Design a protein with these regions (language model features):
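Acidic, PIN/NYN-like endoribonuclease modules and their adjacent C-terminal/linker elements
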Residues: 1, 101, 105-132
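Short, well-structured N-terminal submotif of metal-dependent ribonuclease cores
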Residues: 1-36, 46-59
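Short beta-strand scaffold positions
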Residues: 4, 36, 69, 112-113
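Generic structural signal for small/hydrophobic residues in well-ordered secondary structure
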Residues: 5-6, 44, 78, 104
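A generic structural signal for short hydrophobic patches within well-formed alpha-helices
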Residues: 9-10, 41-44, 118
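A general structural signal for well-ordered alpha-helical segments in protein cores
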Residues: 21, 41, 54, 75-79, ...
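Short, hinge-like loop/turn segments at secondary-structure boundaries
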Residues: 51-55, 85-86, 128-132
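Active-site neighborhoods of divalent-metal-dependent phosphate/nucleic-acid chemistry enzymes
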Residues: 66-112
């Protein structure tokens, strides 16, 4: 199953025509197993000011499977990811990316992203990813 990060969803929803936008559209059209985490839903919806558009996008996103942190162990794993990367000289800009990575690792998901934090996490912590 492919966990799609906020960076890719935003390109897709804004119709930017990026390689990530086209790949996600292809995955969805081919009924591939695409999923989100609640954190990604939050990041997407917080930036949509128009109420009607917010509701439409929310309803669309909620059609996909949602994976969430598995309790305190996910938050501890996120901290471990951050510390491991820092110990290897890799800077993680957003702590939330460590939590998204923890959810992906715990659930055996492959993360589709366009965010350098995940490149660093993959190098340090065995996160399975693909990006374009």
């Amino acid at each position: 199953m492919i966990l799609v990060d906020t960076s890719v969803w935003i390109d897709f929803l804004e119709g930017k025509g990026s390689p990530q936008h086209h790949k996600l559209r292809m995955l969805i059209e081919n009924d591939e197993d695409v999923c989100l985490t609640g954190i990604v839903v939050t990041e997407i919806l917080q930036g949509i000011r128009d109420e009607r558009q917010n509701r439409e996008i929310r309803d669309y996103l909620l059609e996909f499977p949602i994976f969430n942190p598995q309790g305190m162990s996910s938050y501890i794993r996120a901290a471990e990811i951050y510390r491991t990367c820092a110990g290897k000289g890799k800077t993680i800009r957003k702590t939330i990316d460590c939590l998204i990575a923890a959810v992906a690792i715990e659930n055996g998901l492959v993360l589709f992203h366009n965010d350098r934090d995940f490149v660093n996490i993959q190098a340090c912590c065995g996160l399975k990813t693909f990006s374009l």
